[in-house]
Amino acid sequence: MEKQTVAVLGPGSWGTALSQVLNDNGHEVRIWGNLPEQINEINTHHTNKHYFKDVVLDENIIAYTDLAETLKDVDAILFVVPTKVTRLVAQQVAQTLDHKVIIMHASKGLEPDSHKRLSTILEEEIPEHLRSDIVVVSGPSHAEETIVRDLTLITAASKDLQTAQYVQELFSNHYFRLYTNTDVIGVETAGALKNIIAVGAGALHGLGFGDNAKAAIIARGLAEITRLGVALGASPLTYSGLSGVGDLIVTGTSIHSRNWRAGDALGRGESLADIEANMGMVIEGISTTRAAYELAQELGVYMPITQAIYQVIYHGTNIKDAIYDIMNNEFKAENEWS
């Protein structure tokens, strides 16, 4: 692939890691953010110490606060901003962009009030004459591992296969490999909903439960994620792939996962306010829990784990009581769909 110019919107942990992947592949990378101190640190010291204390970035990676300068003559734009501001940033891009580009996003969540997927938001806010079909970049990936060039395999999903293949080639190298998929709904819902299950898995650890319980929540969590995804139009096969069970395993079992760590702290009795203050990073699983719960209620989809976590987070239900309620639900067959 010829050298491409890519704007990465969002200098968080994952945006920074993906910027390095693109730079390693010989592309021009421009990171955009709205914190002058952070942007200056990236350009002056080639570090982003809030996320990576010991990592030095290539000096070819340039950061900007000016969106127009960032987007000038770019070939592709990668959104890696928190879910709650995706629409706002997309509106700013639509007002600034003056040519057609490939639009990608690598964030995982649902818009809190509308319950919409992020690709839908980007489609709504960025006119068709300025963009390709949206490409979702998602899968089992800790930024802490990708930034040190550990092996990572994820998915590029788009309704248009050729556009997904462009992104596959854009990112893939000897340590970072992408597979294509045309099931955007499946890949996107898997990436968003696994954060909820990761909060639950972390809570079980914080409460002192063993591996049996942790395996159960991942397996049963995958079942309810699949039920909701299929109700929205996804293929059930997607959830057995990298963006489904793969991402759920890596997020639901690792201390690298901020959603798992948040759940672990909840299980140990910390308040949600203290957890969010101490974490210093967005915990997408918290807001996604409400969106998924309300969406499941609207569609009549059975999601007992999501419901339990929703009750704990938003109504102050005791975690042990929530677990007791799940364990005393009506008996069901394992493959029952409701």
Swiss-Prot record:
Q: Name one GO biological process term.
A: glycerol-3-phosphate catabolic process
Q: Where in the cell is it found?
A: Cytoplasm
Name the PROSITE patterns on file.
Answer: NAD_G3PDH (PS00957)
The principal localisation class reads cytoplasm
For this protein, the Enzyme Commission number is 1.1.1.94
Q: Which GO terms describe its cellular component?
A: cytosol
Residues reported in the UniProt entry to bind NADPH: S13, W14, K108, A143, R258, V282, E284
Q: In which pathway does it act?
A: Membrane lipid metabolism; glycerophospholipid metabolism
What does UniProt list as catalytic? K194
Would you say which domain of life the source belongs to? Bacteria
Give the record's keywords alphabetically.
Answer: Cytoplasm, Lipid biosynthesis, Lipid metabolism, NAD, NADP, Nucleotide-binding, Oxidoreductase, Phospholipid biosynthesis, Phospholipid metabolism
- Keyword Lipid metabolism in record: yes
First-level EC class: oxidoreductase
Q: Which residues bind sn-glycerol 3-phosphate?
A: K108, G139, S141, K194, D247, S257, R258, N259
Q: Which reaction does it catalyse?
A: sn-glycerol 3-phosphate + NAD(+) = dihydroxyacetone phosphate + NADH + H(+); sn-glycerol 3-phosphate + NADP(+) = dihydroxyacetone phosphate + NADPH + H(+)
Q: What GO molecular functions are on record for this protein?
A: glycerol-3-phosphate dehydrogenase [NAD(P)+] activity; NAD binding
Q: Its biological function?
A: Catalyzes the reduction of the glycolytic intermediate dihydroxyacetone phosphate (DHAP) to sn-glycerol 3-phosphate (G3P), the key precursor for phospholipid synthesis.
Record-stated family: Belongs to the NAD-dependent glycerol-3-phosphate dehydrogenase family.
Checking HAMAP family in the record gives: NAD_Glyc3P_dehydrog
> Which PANTHER family does UniProt cross-reference here?
GLYCEROL-3-PHOSPHATE DEHYDROGENASE (PTHR11728), GLYCEROL-3-PHOSPHATE DEHYDROGENASE [NAD(+)] 2, CHLOROPLASTIC (PTHR11728:SF1)
Q: Which NCBIfam families match?
A: PRK00094.1-2 (NF000940), PRK00094.1-3 (NF000941), PRK00094.1-4 (NF000942)
- What is the official name of this protein in its record? Glycerol-3-phosphate dehydrogenase [NAD(P)+]
Protein species of origin: Streptococcus pneumoniae (strain Hungary19A-6)
Q: What is the lineage of its organism?
A: Bacteria, Bacillati, Bacillota, Bacilli, Lactobacillales
Name the gene that codes for it: gpsA
